Amino acid sequence: LFENHKDELPKYEVILIDETQDYQENWIRIIMKYFASENAEIVAFADEKQNIYSRELDNEKMPRIPVQTGAWDRKLNKSYRLSQKIALLVTDFQKRFFADKYVVEQQIETNTMMSLFDEPYIEYHYYPLKESVKEDNAIATYIYQQIKEHRFHSNDVTILSSRIRMLRKLDYMLRTESKEKTNIMFETREEFMKLCPNAQTGFENNADILKIRKNRKANFWMNRGTIKLSTIHSFKGWESPVLFLVIEDNLKATK
């Protein structure tokens, strides 16, 4: 793709690569080969704790990238998005699930002003689910009721799950029962029923559904004034004032 046009491509003296933990090594090699000038400075930023695609790590449990000539600089260790309460939760989670996989921080430094004036409220709820059920009605109903009861502003709300089946049901409830506009990265319930009329589990997909998901993800916008629903892999939701996170029992701790 690039080789036949390499002389026409722009070359840059400085290249900044963010979220490097999501990159395959070959992608970075392409950037270096076709877009970097001869003496270009390439700076990569990565967070191994967000290695959701399970990219290979080096001997120090850090992202492996071809531009690296020395050890990773760990000076960027202060969070400007997490309050103290969330930071403590994140640290405990790392120690419980990531101790053998990553180098775990003993304490995350946070923004003091955020902790003073924007301390979050955290609740936990457990719902047993049956795989034979096509739609996760109990969870969808609970989240829908919470949004109505607390009168959350639509733009403040993000709902994340690894299970599109539940998100699809909740999106349908929000649109039909409360007339909410939503911002999603997957097919609607109506589209799913049309494209998979013989679905048995609610997890089925095909080329048409995958195309819809790709297009919706490309057009996803954080501040559209609507409730956002997404999978954990597509959107992390750190900036959302109100976040509903659905975690299934069958998720592997190493993922």
Regions found by a protein language model. Name each.
Residues 1-2, 14-255:
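Conserved helicase motor core of SF1/SF2 NTP-dependent helicases
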Residues 10-12:
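A short acidic, Gly/Pro-enriched loop at the edge of an enzyme's catalytic core
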